[in-house]
Amino acid sequence: MIYRMQYRTAALVMVIFALACAAGCSSPETAAPSVPIITTEPTIIPTPESTLATVQAADMALQLTDIPPDYILRERSVMTSPEVTQLTRDLGWRQGYFVTFDRTGRSRNDQTRIRQSVNIFPVENMNKVFTLEKVALSEGETPFSSPYEIPFPTIGDQSIAYRMTNTPDEGQVTYTVIFTKKNAFERITMAGTSTDYETLKDIAEMAGAKIL
């Protein structure tokens, strides 16, 4: 009797243990919390634009195709050190180039000239070069007229334009534009009896675009 009760008790314990094991095995495991993956975008550092022109002064010069068709090419040449002033050399002048175009109208007295000069300096001297040239232009009075600043599109890094009557004869006018871009300084003049302000603006913008 005692053995039978012990047997039943042991059997009951085994059944309970088996059920507990089955319940434990069948219960789902607790899922580990998901950790978000953070991706870092690469930092893009813009390449700074060069402050030095990548083309030679001769390649910045205007071409005949840039000028109205009634002009002819008169002269184009490199500039040499003796052709520039001592002050220009003191400012570190390195090289230069100039080109001249002429136009003759229906009469011998109707003549107009476009001249461009390109000069290369150390980039750290460009502000000084521009300031000195601007002062020289603004103070360039003649017995007949004084230069005065005129509205003009911004060309390059710094630019300014002047208009002046050269002689007592009506119609003789000189426009002068100076500008800097990178380490290049340019002066463009249009002088004569058939000057054209709008044409000058187009020419100056083309000249500025040639400095790369």
PLM regions with names:
Residues 111-115, 170-176:
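Short, surface-exposed coil-to-beta transition loops
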Residues 183, 187-212:
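Surface-exposed amphipathic alpha-helical segments
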Residues 95-134:
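A short acidic-to-branched-hydrophobic micro-motif
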Residues 115-117, 178, 185-189:
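Structural recognition of the beta-strand scaffold that forms the well-ordered cores
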Residues 1-43, 47, 67:
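Secretory targeting signatures
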Residues 33-105, 142-155, 199, 203-204, ...:
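N-terminal "mature-domain start" segment
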Residues 145-174:
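Signature of long, low-cysteine stretches enriched in small and polar/charged residues
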Residues 72, 122-125, 135-138, 205-212:
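Sec-exported extracytoplasmic/periplasmic mature domains
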